A protein has these predicted regions:
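Conserved glycine-rich cofactor-binding loop
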Residues: 46, 53-54
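Conserved glycine-rich Rossmann-like NAD(P)H-binding loop of the short-chain dehydrogenase/reductase
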Residues: 67-83
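C-terminal helical subdomain
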Residues: 6-13, 21-26, 205, 251-293, ...
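Short alpha-helix in the Rossmann-fold core of NAD(P)-dependent oxidoreductases
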Residues: 134, 145-159, 172, 205-206, ...
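Catalytic loop of short-chain dehydrogenase/reductase
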Residues: 128-138, 142, 164-224, 231-251
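The beta1-alpha1 cofactor-binding region of Rossmann-like NAD(H)/NADP(H)-dependent oxidoreductases
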Residues: 78, 96-112
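Non-catalytic terminal and boundary segments that flank Rossmann-like NAD(P)-dependent oxidoreductase
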Residues: 1-48, 183, 298-320
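Rossmann-fold scaffold of SDR-type NAD(P)-dependent oxidoreductases
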Residues: 50, 120-128, 148, 172-176, ...
């Protein structure tokens, strides 16, 4: 990457309004001469996508099947997931797998179903929502952490042998730029009723996701499976409309489209660049730091990382 391009990218990255909004991909796609997603061939690829029925997930699903992939869409609603799968473009195919990522028994059943259907070479953790009220699953785990941290960890563990057969398989996590405001916490990862705030809980979950992505990369050889996380910038999706209506009203004209938000996700699935490293965090097809603030970086210690891994393993029931 040329020095002048790196300098220009840093100028774009510095103010959030240029980096996270639609201005970012408009400038960076020209700066780096992005390869068109239409040029990739995914025939023969088997991709598991959670949260593929709306927003960024749906935009990615449409790309995957149009490029020829065999897609397994994991969704909570059978009617909606099957309807979405039936409407996705060819030449690829899509099959619905029904599960709530926050229900660990359903995650285990979904993983078994995926294996029965032939397994996968790529697993995408995209499901996730920002909820205003605190809820817990049947195991007593706060719903955001259950569905966005523990459930994905469990599914990754169960599908790891299948993913490894691709040599390398790929695991990609859709995080959020909101995690930049949150430090790494384990004892307070699940917010209590008296302190609960949906946006803060979401940010803590996303911070944990990105940290777990890096930890997975240290535990699994990149010759077997590579791990990447990314954030989409600020995109105009049904989730943003429902959970952040004021933000959407103010930023509306500058928000990215779903296709722009999903671009790097699709690229990480399709391009060979994703197989050259593991454990990275991306925005607009470039690796990014996981901390922007010294206050959050201070919380990210080796001891706390080890505690996070053990904690998630315990909640997922995957401790050996």
């Amino acid at each position: 990457m040329s020095t002048w391009k790196s300098i220009v990218d840093k100028v774009i990255e510095a103010p959030v309004v240029t980096s996270f909004t639609s201005i970012g991909p408009a400038l960076r796609s020209r700066l780096d001469d992005w390869t068109s997603l239409d040029s990739y061939d995914l025939i023969g690829r088997r991709i598991v996508l959670t949260g593929g029925t709306s927003g960024l997930g749906l935009a990615a699903a449409e790309r995957f099947t149009s490029l020829g992939a065999t897609l397994l869409v994991v969704g909570r609603s059978r009617d909606k997931t099957e309807r979405i799968c039936a409407g996705l473009p060819g030449p690829g195919t899509a099959t619905a797998v029904i599960a709530d990522l926050g229900d660990f028994d359903q995650v285990r059943a979904a993983a078994n179903e995926i294996l029965d259907l032939g397994g996968a070479d790529t697993l995408i953790h995209n499901a996730g929502a920002l909820t205003a009220d605190r809820r817990t699953n049947a195991a007593g785990v706060e719903a955001t952490i259950a569905s966005q941290v523990v459930g994905p960890h469990l599914m990754t563990t169960l599908l790891l042998p299948s993913l490894s057969e691709a040599a390398p398989g790929r695991v990609i996590t859709m995080a959020s730029g909101g995690m930049y405001a949150a430090g790494l916490t384990v004892r307070q990862l699940q917010m209590d009723d008296d302190e609960y705030g949906g946006s803060e809980q979401y940010a803590r979950a996303k911070r944990a996701q990105v940290t777990m992505n890096e930890l997975w990369a240290t535990k699994v050889s990149p010759a077997k499976v590579v791990f990447h996380a990314m954030h989409p910038g600020w995109a105009d999706t049904p989730g943003v409309e429902a959970s952040l209506p004021t933000f959407r009203k103010v930023m509306g004209p500058l928000l990215r489209s779903a296709d722009q938000g999903a671009d790097t996700l699709v690229w990480l699935v399709a391009d060979d660049e994703a197989t050259t490293t593991s454990g990275d965090f991306w925005l607009d097809r470039r690796r990014r730091p996981i901390h922007k603030l010294p206050t959050t970086k201070k919380t990210d210690t080796p001891e706390r990382r080890a505690q996070l891994w053990e904690y998630v393993e315990q909640l997922a029931g995957t401790r050996s």
